[in-house]
UniProtKB/Swiss-Prot annotation:
Pfam families: Helicase_C (PF00271), ResIII (PF04851), UVR (PF02151), UvrB (PF12344), UvrB_inter (PF17757). GO terms for cellular component: cytoplasm; excinuclease repair complex. Its main location: cytoplasm. This is UvrABC system protein B. Residues 35-419 form the Helicase ATP-binding domain. The keyword Nucleotide-binding applies. ATP binds at G48, A49, T50, G51, T52, G53, K54, T55. Residues 657-692 form the UVR domain. Residues 438-604 form the Helicase C-terminal domain. Keywords: ATP-binding, Cytoplasm, DNA damage, DNA excision, DNA repair, Excision nuclease, Nucleotide-binding, SOS response. A motif (Beta-hairpin) lies at residues 101-124.
């Protein structure tokens, strides 16, 4: 349900900033997509071969359409990658990232067979939560917004109308009773903290109020003259540096699940009524244990809501709080978009089925909890959207995939093709070889690639075969690693980076070497047991796997098989069709395929560089431990917190140097605990402080 209140959104044009112009198939693909969307087609499919620059095509399409856009990705990694690339295209527009804010999530569950109740357990990522709030804030205040999301977009979120109603508009010259404003902030779940400025808090110093919104990296300073707002300024939360002077600002709630006192009162009455009805049903059926369990749990939750306005698992009462009818769809991110937004579904052959499958998986767990008295039936209305509810909420949709699924191809009036790569690279040559002696043949092919300094991907059907092959290749002196499902995301990224850097030569995997892997150094993809029909050897899986060799000038794919299956034939024919088109285009335009040079780098490298720079600074100016004023009796965390409370502009050079040392220690500690978002934020703070310090040193010379 979109907000009924008329919201004035800031209008600024999308403007692509890039040193490149559309090339290859991009110009005709962008023009055709624009024509189809503007003519009112609801479903448009872009069949984009691997490496043809689909992200850039989306950016130029957004610039032409000038409409808010939601891009849905199948996982967090691809969403982060896509958002980062779009940010380089749109430095002056809002490119937001909306994914689940859980680092770890164990849902509430009950296993009747063993009478085991598992309580909900989770670990929140504060930086990702800020980005979620930033997304909804941008959607409600401006039109030049692109949100990159996972299926989190279809999960329950607070009511947009209530979120807008609780928004606090502030304007210079406006009459405001200061204490009333503080009460409004507390009602909106902000916490007063006069010591340290953290997100979701505010502090008061005389006639000055400083608010640290959850959706901003910067803070807001409100200066009063009596009961009148004299000035509004956006400032850096650490240094206190003024970033901008504002005439008007909006302060949104500190949580998406905000509800006023009247709404909460109404919700509690509704929960009590449902509880009485449910208890009557359970007692009538002789389920006395379940009835007692439900009574104790729900009355405790109601008491918590009455006393503090919230309770553990309050999302299970969202239907009552939102005032929705039983069985109705929850509010979600889609409801925060204006009516004319454009949806882009990337890797649609994976993402569309994923959207359809979310509801049933969630519902089976909830039904068990309700049947055994752990939750009221209304808890089942705290859920993701059903697929038909999703389609009702979206308008025009562009599907992107190298292998579009049957759902999208049936709905679209033909596909738009993007096959020619800007680099002139062509699809890899596919060779089919018999399985007899396949390992010895594979070793010979690997050695040829290793001598050239290239990487190799090998995909097998089973975990056992992947492990055995890895051991066998290593015994024969080939540097090999094995990528499997038990390796966490960060380690997986590290392995791929090591392959690109040449620290090993062969990566063996099962179903992980497909969508989104960008490895220009790989010139050979070997597919073992290619003729074993099934999910891992379907035509779409094979085409996606073949695409991993499409970013190398010498790209080649070897399929080991004793017969050519229907899936293999489709994959080979489609690859050859694309290859013929690409080679004909290159010949006609005199294009010599250029190897793709993609920068190898990650967050750990940037953190290491920042740490090394601090060490050099400490050595040069002799700041840090052992110096006068260093207090060894407090922890690094306490010291860093003290540092943040200081106004940097008034700090002595030596104190500023010590603060940089402390923050660098904290950054390294965060990186060691794999808290990379925290470490990245600290890295940015440290860079700002070093700039300030170097200016101080220069001024004092």
């Amino acid at each position: 349900m979109r907000p009924v209140t008329d919201i004035t959104r800031r209008v600024a044009p999308f403007h692509v900033v890039s040193e490149f112009q559309p090339s290859g198939d991009q110009p005709q693909a962008i023009a055709e997509l624009e024509k189809r969307v503007n003519s009112g087609e609801q479903d448009v499919v872009l069949l984009g071969a691997t490496g043809t620059g689909k992200t850039a095509t989306v950016a130029w399409l957004a610039e032409r359409l000038q409409r808010p856009m939601l891009v849905m990705q199948p996982n967090k990694t691809l969403a982060a990658q896509f958002a980062q690339e779009l940010r380089t295209f749109f430095p002056d527009n809002a490119v937001e990232y909306f994914v689940s804010y859980y680092d770890y999530y164990q849902p509430e569950a009950y296993i009747p067979q063993t009478d085991t109740y598992i309580e909900k357990d989770s670990s929140l990522n504060e930086e990702v939560e800020r980005l979620r709030h930033s997304a909804t804030n941008s959607l409600l205040t401006r039109r030049d917004v692109i949100v990159v999301s996972t299926v989190s977009a279809i999960y329950g979120l607070g009511t947009p109308q209530e979120y807008v109603d609780r928004m606090i508009p502030l304007e210079v010259g406006q009459e405001w009773d200061r204490d009333e404003l503080l009460r409004d902030l507390v009602t909106n779940q902000y916490v007063r903290n006069d010591i340290s400025g953290e997100r979701g808090t505010f502090r008061v110093r005389g006639d000055t109020l400083e608010i640290f919104p959850v959706y901003e990296e910067n803070a807001l300073r409100v200066e009063f003259f009596g009961d009148e707002i004299e000035a509004l300024t956006t400032m850096h939360p650490l240094t206190g540096e003024i970033i901008s002077e504002d005439e008007q600002v909006y302060v949104f709630p500190a949580t998406h699940y905000v509800a006023g006192p009247e709404r909460m009162e109404r919700a509690i009455a509704s929960i009590q009524q449902e509880l009485e009805e449910r208890l009557a049903v359970l007692e009538r059926d002789g389920k006395l244990l379940e009835a007692q369990r439900l009574r104790m749990r729900t009355t405790y939750d109601i008491e918590m809501m009455q006393q503090v306005g919230a309770c553990a698992g309050i999302e299970n009462y969202s239907r009552h709080i939102d005032g929705r009818a039983p069985g109705s769809a929850p509010n979600c991110l889609l409801d925060y978009f204006p009516e004319d937004f454009v949806l882009v579904i990337d890797e649609s052959h994976v993402t569309v089925p994923q959207i359809g499958g979310m509801y049933e998986g969630d519902m089976s767990r909830k039904r068990t909890l309700v049947e055994h008295g752990f939750r009221l039936p209304s808890a089942m209305d705290n859920r993701p959207l059903k697929f038909d509810e999703f389609t009702q909420r979206i308008g025009q949709t562009v599907y992107l995939s190298a292998t579009p699924g049957s759902y999208e191809t049936e709905r679209a009036h033909g596909v738009v093709e993007q096959i020619i790569r800007p680099t002139g690279l062509v699809d890899p040559e596919i060779i089919v070889k018999p399985t007899r002696g396949q390992i010895d043949d594979l070793m010979g092919e690997i050695r040829t690639r290793v001598d050239r300094g290239d990487g190799v991907l090998v995909t097998t059907l089973t975990k056992k075969m992947a492990e055995d092959l890895t051991d066998y290749l290593m015994e024969h002196g080939i540097r090999t690693r094995y990528l499997h499902s038990e390796i966490d995301t960060l380690k997986r990224i590290e392995l791929l980076k090591e392959l690109r850097m040449g620290e090993f030569d062969v990566l063996v995997g099962i179903n992980l070497l497909r969508e989104g892997l960008d490895l220009p150094e790989v010139s050979l993809v070997a597919i073992l047991d290619a003729d074993k029909e099934g999910f891992l050897r379907s035509e779409r899986s094979l085409i996606q796997t073949v695409g991993r060799a499409a970013r190398n000038v010498n790209g080649q794919v070897i399929m080991y098989a004793d017969q050519i299956t229907d899936s293999m034939q489709v994959a080979i024919d489609e690859t050859n069709r694309r290859r013929d088109i690409q080679m004909a285009y290159n010949k006609e335009h005199g294009i010599d395929p250029q190897p793709l040079r993609k920068k190898i780098g990650d967050i750990t490298e940037m953190l290491a560089r920042e740490g090394a720079d601090t060490d050099e600074l400490v050595e040069k100016f002799n700041y840090g431990k052992g110096q006068r004023g260093y207090n060894s009796m407090i922890t690094d965390e306490q010291r860093a917190a003290q540092g943040r409370r200081l106004d940097v502009s008034k700090m002595a050079e030596e104190d500023l140097g010590k603060l940089i040392v402390d923050l660098t220690t904290e950054m390294r500690s965060a990186a060691g605990e794999l808290k990379f978002e925290v470490a990245a934020r600290l890295r940015d703070e440290i860079a700002d402080l070093k700039k300030e310090l170097r200016q101080m040193v220069e001024a004092n010379r």
